[in-house]
């Protein structure tokens, strides 16, 4: 069966590099499913889970906090703002951080501070949802 070369990279590190049968991820306009031979595409990515079905039938789940996707017929590159392997997600920690960010939002004075905290809240909410879904055995 044909495969895709997949790279998931954050600003800090390469999270995944390998061959995959398909990739599912949260595109700007909705969920995207990428198979080998897909039409070239560039899209923004929403916060959520990137599901990679490896060539060996194993599965990788990676939370991304947003970023850019590039698709070529034989490759997928995810340039994520932040990327965390599913095994490293902690729902309780994400919920606690979200509560702290909500408090910061209540205390924010100017529009720039509010925008930064709102972006962080959106990312933390998506992270908590992704952690909950992965804990329940669902990825999408």
UniProtKB/Swiss-Prot annotation:
Cellular localisation: Cell inner membrane
Pfam families: ATP-synt_DE_N
GO MF annotation, one: ATP binding
CDD domains named among the record's database cross-references: F1-ATPase_delta
Signal peptide: none
GO cellular component: plasma membrane; proton-transporting ATP synthase complex
Family indicated by similarity: Belongs to the ATPase epsilon chain family.
UniProt keyword terms in alphabetical order: ATP synthesis, Cell inner membrane, Cell membrane, CF(1), Hydrogen ion transport, Ion transport, Membrane, Transport
Subunit structure: F-type ATPases have 2 components, CF(1) - the catalytic core - and CF(0) - the membrane proton channel. CF(1) has five subunits: alpha(3), beta(3), gamma(1), delta(1), epsilon(1). CF(0) has three main subunits: a, b and c.
UniProt-recorded name of the protein: ATP synthase epsilon chain
InterPro entries given in the database record: ATP_F1_dsu/esu_C_sf, ATP_synth_F1_dsu/esu, ATP_synth_F1_dsu/esu_N, ATPsynth_dsu/esu_N
Domain of life: Bacteria
Topology versus the membrane: Peripheral membrane protein
Keyword RNA-binding included in the entry's annotation: no
Role description: Produces ATP from ADP in the presence of a proton gradient across the membrane.
């Amino acid at each position: 069966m044909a495969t895709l070369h997949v790279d998931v990279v954050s600003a800090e590190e390469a999270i995944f590099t390998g061959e995959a049968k398909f990739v599912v991820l949260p595109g700007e306009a909705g969920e995207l499913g990428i198979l080998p031979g897909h039409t070239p595409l560039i899209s923004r990515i929403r916060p959520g889970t990137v599901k990679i079905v490896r060539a060996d039938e194993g599965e990788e789940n990676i939370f991304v906090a947003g970023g850019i996707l590039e698709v070529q017929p034989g490759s997928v590159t995810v340039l994520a703002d932040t990327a965390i392997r599913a095994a490293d997600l902690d729902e309780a920690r994400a919920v606690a951080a979200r509560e702290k960010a909500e408090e910061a939002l209540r205390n924010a004075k100017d529009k720039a501070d509010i925008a930064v905290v709102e972006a962080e809240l959106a990312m933390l909410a998506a992270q908590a949802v992704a952690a909950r879904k992965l804990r329940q055995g669902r990825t999408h």
